[in-house]
Amino acid sequence: MNHLCKSFSKLHPHPAFRIASKLLHGSRNSSTTAASSAPEKIVIPRRIERSPTDILNALSSTVGFDPTAAHYKYHDDPYLVPTSNVAKKTYAMAQEAGRKAAHWIRQENAKLFQHKEAAPSVPAFIPTMVYNEKSQVEVTDLEKLIGNVEVKDAVLVYNLLKKNNIEVSVELKQSMMELLCFFNHEESLAEEYIEERWFRQGVTEKGRQRKTWKDFELAEQIFHEIEDKKPEHYCALIRGMAKYFQVEKAWALYQETIEKGILLDTATFNSLLQIASFLKESYEMRWNLVCEVLTTMKNQGLLPNIGTLNAVLQTITTIGGYNHPRTYALKTLSEFKKLGIEPSLASWYYMLAIFCRERGPTSHILHDIMNEIENKEFHIQDPKDTFFFVTAMDVCRNHLHDKDLAKRVNKLLHFKDNYNLIGDSYKESIYYRQFLSVLCNTEPLETFMETYNLLVPNVYIPEPSVMEDILKCIDVNCAVDYLPQIWSHMIQFDHTGRENLLNLILQIMVTNPPQNPELVDKFTAIAWDMYKRLEELIAAGSNRNQRSTGFSGALLGDILTICCRGKDYEKAQMLFEKINNDQNAIVGDPKVMAMRAFIELSIEEKKPSLAVSCLQYCAENGFPESVELGRLIHTSMTLDEVHIGKIHRYVGADALKPSKVEEEEGK
């Protein structure tokens, strides 16, 4: 035992034990001083408001952007990641529908959700108050509803307060009127419904250039109830009417403020500048109206801001011609820069709309804009900021056809957090459509496919028009090695019902016969897969009593040609029987190349009956090459009297004689 103890004493302690020992002795020595000093006060930081995706964005920033991975809102599973634009929207909105269902269950069964375990309580977990005509309400209820942007309940509570003769302060009336004017008496979409905003915004923007203001509603009633009207009351109503294009009333209120000497704020003047094109018809009168409003602002001692600049440029975009709008725009930009107002992305969007018109002369202003804003981070300052990137990429493709400029725009989009300004799903789809199209038409195919593989399918799913451009580029470059990949993507993206794409990919495979045996087999598989999918599509259409164009002769002929090149006689025979038996249902005739390929394969497989049947089809449909095909069958196969008789009957005795070339070679 003594020897064991001695051996333990000779062992060197582990470094971790030495560190622990030092810490222990240090803590003992400092315990006396710590006891004498005052205890440290713990300060709890204030709560930070976070959106549902803030933590995810913080984690994502640590690893960078990965275009090969699906968006985090989709399940990371090959069978659950959407592979089409429709599926992307369906999956995302289904998830959103689950959130809405949870909110509905909580609201409909509010009695079951009265427990408050969180401290402090989380308002989002608590069912909202339900109001009706019999509710006992107070002014504080209206204040909460206005603060929570619950428009319909706020209207109901305001009317109940008025009905019960409960006085509402002028300040609260002002807040109520601002809420109604901003949302036009309609309920706003909750902030947590991110996906619905993402997929909905592009649709709602299309119908905004028309009057949607609700006349004689509560906002106007509150305005007329206020006896001592102040400038903020006029400002709220004018801005609401201008936003929803009730331009006549908005301008009449503005004239009333001028007559009464009421001073307005800059935002109200900006809203009036935005509707100048609705107030005046001629271009010169519109510009004069803009100058008049700006002069009034100056006389009232107001300084313009970025909203003023964008409102003026927006009006200039409605002025026709080429010289006057450009002159006005450059003067405006110069004057505002003298005032120290830097343009936002919306300003540059309006400049592109003014200079790069569809039928106007070519302008290279986008080069100057990019020199000005390259490698800068932007934040939203105007709703139209989200239009810049999609418009700039459209200019690169359709106006300038410049791939280098397109890459500069794309680099700016991905600089820091600029991607937040892409807008919505509709603008994002258009942006990448233009980007891929300009690269497809200007870059080498190999370089383009690198970008294609980077973006497709997780970031962008090509539309049929983009897929058509890619197929044409493959045809021009004879790069048939990419066809299997493109066909697999067409299946994923549900493009297999597009007849123009099917005809194009078949034409490429027919006119560019591959030398690689493996590629020949892949082409055969593609052609046969195409045939089976079309057959299912036509059958499904007939079951639903829908009109279908059916198969075309040219399409079936191309599929037959490819199957014959792949030496797949069984499939080729099925295709020929389809062509031969359903002649009345097939539109047009196949090419003679397909018939020749099938006859040659039948000769190779020693099937004289099918070769003669194909000859009969050619003769009955008036192919000029029928005699030549009959001679090919007669000279290449050992035929019995029955087959020879059929050849004679179908194409005549000339097919049984040697051709002139053969006679000359015999001599």
Where do the PLM segments sit?
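A basic, Ser/Thr-enriched alpha-helical scaffold prevalent
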Residues: N2-K667
